[in-house]
Amino acid sequence: MKKLLLYLFLITAGLISTVQVSAQKEIAPGVIKLQKGEIDTFTPYSLFGGKPVIEAMKALPAAKLPFDAKDVQIKITDRGCLIEVPLEDNEQIYGFGLQFETFGQRGLRKRPIVNDNPLNGLGYTHAPQTFYVSTKGYGILVNTARYTTFLCGSNQKTEHSRQQRIEERKHIATTTEDLYKNRSNGNKIFIDVPGAKGIEVFVITGP
């Protein structure tokens, strides 16, 4: 019995450790760094990042996140890292670098990858960035050089009714954008970073 209880305790502790962010630090006014696991040696910030201009940033008006930074979850598995960021119903998402086919990214799947001849709206572009901004006044930067996929609120809420799903499926997709767009409002952005043993996420607030 004692062995069983010990086993259950270890399993539970392991599951919790895959979700909780191991480090949270404000590295500049309005910039919070979330970190978990073993960070890659080469990342955009480690290679090109300069020092924040602290005094100039202090002069900017303070902004409040629409969620607690602790609500951002980072899970590390054998496959890589999965990041979950809360998303409100009336929130729109923009970014991921120079995008040709789409502007508002809510409800879409984006994979920012360098491509000199992008033929679709999935994220391939001349100047991709693992960064997006929200109409709620904040930005999310995933500090990684790995191929990263963003599911921008395309998940189904658990309370989403069966009838609503049936109605939405009546719409026939005729473009790539429509194919990956979800008519319902998901409540999270899922960020998938395969192969990563750890990750840094910068949460940036602004006026």
What does each model-found stretch correspond to?
Residues Q24-P207:
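Catalytic and substrate-binding clefts that recognize carbohydrates or anionic sugar/phosphate headgroups
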